[in-house]
């Protein structure tokens, strides 16, 4: 169950990033995190903090709730 949430969240982050035609490196720079961290989130290898969820939503120009949808 826990992993399912991380997988779905990571997929949403990746979908939004690709919609904006951003590489992981470009996106990481905008969000203020390391590129490998973005990769780990997208692959559901990292349990993300609320602070970093906020950074990611801001960098993607979406609401935090958009990243969670119906998780």
Residue ranges and their predicted role:
Residues 18, 29, 58:
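Alpha-helical residues within the helix-turn-helix
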Residues 11-26:
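Short basic helix-loop element that most often maps to the first helix and adjoining turn
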Residues 13, 27-28, 38-41, 67:
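Conserved hydrophobic/aromatic packing and binding residues within compact polymer-binding modules
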């Amino acid at each position: 169950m826990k992993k399912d949430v991380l997988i779905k969240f990571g997929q949403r982050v990746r979908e939004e990033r690709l919609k904006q035609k951003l590489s992981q490196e470009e996106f990481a720079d905008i969000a203020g995190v390391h590129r490998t961290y973005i990769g780990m989130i997208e692959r559901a290898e990292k349990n993300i903090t609320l602070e970093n969820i906020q950074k990611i939503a801001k960098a993607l120009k979406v609401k935090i709730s958009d990243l969670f949808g119906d998780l």
